[in-house]
């Protein structure tokens, strides 16, 4: 559905600079046509403004004069996302509860829920109003799913798992599988029962094939508005705060506490029973073996402060040459020692 730029500006609370026109969609600066909106969030792409054919560009005031028609924003990337939502069509075409889904008689479904074929909702589970469960979703007994949640195909909530309002679970997510708890004995490795639960706050998004394990006792928790990427492993009894960004292939071992506003880049590994403070940033492939106070930026394995990590990155490519030079110096030193001994 086409919308006038003036309408978009009003809906988004942005300033329109330029001629009003109908807009039919959203695209990149390179590909956008006269009936599409684009955006500039990263300054390194500023050069693309000169040749874009976009009907309008969402930009900061600094770049508004670089295009014939601008929607002026203090956060172009965020407002691009809001614009995209206005033009995009949500996935799925069904509504209501399919006859081919299994809904236990003791389960409770809120108003306006959609449950696709082959979903399973167990006894005493409660599904909030307007939530959508795609095919293959498993919601075990005593689970709680908040209002307005999206559970994509084959998402699994094991017994007792709770998620808040507005959560998104992508395909293959598993919440509440047993934590990795075992004891070595004289008669083999024995399983420690995992009898706790998992609880997600409101507006949490969990990427495809991520696993968040149930606690041994108590609750494994993820705070409001935290976003977790694909293929992440969160161990039993982890307590994660609000507004965290956890990128793909991160592994967080059991009983670690993660504060609010923490960012972990791809493939970070965190040992168990640690404390990661508020506002901590961990660079890609960081290996965290000790607790980190609030506000630190760290990288490397083992993780060190940012300044040390950056110096290490600078030195590492030079190591082969340095090794040769040191070897040469050692030989020269030995020759000098021999000469000195003869004197």
Curated annotation (Swiss-Prot):
Pathway: Bacterial outer membrane biogenesis; LPS lipid A biosynthesis. It is an enzyme of class 2 (transferase). It catalyses: a UDP-3-O-[(3R)-3-hydroxyacyl]-alpha-D-glucosamine + a (3R)-hydroxyacyl-[ACP] = a UDP-2-N,3-O-bis[(3R)-3-hydroxyacyl]-alpha-D-glucosamine + holo-[ACP] + H(+). Keywords: Acyltransferase, Lipid A biosynthesis, Lipid biosynthesis, Lipid metabolism, Repeat, Transferase. GO terms for molecular function: N-acyltransferase activity. InterPro entries: Hexapep (IPR001451), LpxD (IPR007691), Trimer_LpxA-like_sf (IPR011004), UDP_GlcNAc_AcTrfase_non-rep (IPR020573). It holds the Pfam family Hexapep. GO terms for biological process: lipid A biosynthetic process. It comes from the Bacteria. GO terms for cellular component: membrane. The active site is at 236 (proton acceptor). Transmembrane segments: none annotated. Its EC number is 2.3.1.191. Belongs to the transferase hexapeptide repeat family. LpxD subfamily. Catalyzes the N-acylation of UDP-3-O-acylglucosamine using 3-hydroxyacyl-ACP as the acyl donor. Is involved in the biosynthesis of lipid A, a phosphorylated glycolipid that anchors the lipopolysaccharide to the outer membrane of the cell. Homotrimer. HAMAP family: LpxD. This is UDP-3-O-acylglucosamine N-acyltransferase. The lineage of its organism: Bacteria, Pseudomonadati, Thermodesulfobacteriota, Desulfovibrionia, Desulfovibrionales.
């Amino acid at each position: 559905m086409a919308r006038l730029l003036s309408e978009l500006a009003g809906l988004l609370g942005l300033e329109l600079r330029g001629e009003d026109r109908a807009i039919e969609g959203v695209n990149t600066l390179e590909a956008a046509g006269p009936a599409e909106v684009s955006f500039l969030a990263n300054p390194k792409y500023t050069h693309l403004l000169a040749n874009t054919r976009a009907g309008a560009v969402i930009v900061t005031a600094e770049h508004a004069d670089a295009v014939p028609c601008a929607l002026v924003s203090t956060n172009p990337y965020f407002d691009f996302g809001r614009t995209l939502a206005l033009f995009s069509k949500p996935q799925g075409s069904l509504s209501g509860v399919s006859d081919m889904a299994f809904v236990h008689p003791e389960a409770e479904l809120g108003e306006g829920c959609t449950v696709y074929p082959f979903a399973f909702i167990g006894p005493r589970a409660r599904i909030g109003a307007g939530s959508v469960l795609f095919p293959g979703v498993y919601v075990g007994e005593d689970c709680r799913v908040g209002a307005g949640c999206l559970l994509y195909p084959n998402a699994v909530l094991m017994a007792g798992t709770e998620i808040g309002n507005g959560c998104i679970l992508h395909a293959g997510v598993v919440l509440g599988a047993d934590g990795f708890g075992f004891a070595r004995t004289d008669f083999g490795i024995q399983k420690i029962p995992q009898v706790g639960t998992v609880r997600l706050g409101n507006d949490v998004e969990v990427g495809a094939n991520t696993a968040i394990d149930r606690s041994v006792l108590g609750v494994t928790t993820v705070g409001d508005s935290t976003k977790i990427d694909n293929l992440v492993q969160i161990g039993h009894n982890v307590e994660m705060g609000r507004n965290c960004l956890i990128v793909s292939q991160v592994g967080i071992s059991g009983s670690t506490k993660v504060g609010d506003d923490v960012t972990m880049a791809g493939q970070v590994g965190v040992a168990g029973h640690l404390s990661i403070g508020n506002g901590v940033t961990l660079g890609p492939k960081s290996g965290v073996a000790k607790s980190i106070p609030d506000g630190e930026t760290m990288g490397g394995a083992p993780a060190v402060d940012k300044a040390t990590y950056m110096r290490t990155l600078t030195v590492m490519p030079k190591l082969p040459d340095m090794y040769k030079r040191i070897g040469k110096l050692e030989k020269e030193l030995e020759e000098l020692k021999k000469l000195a001994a003869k004197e």
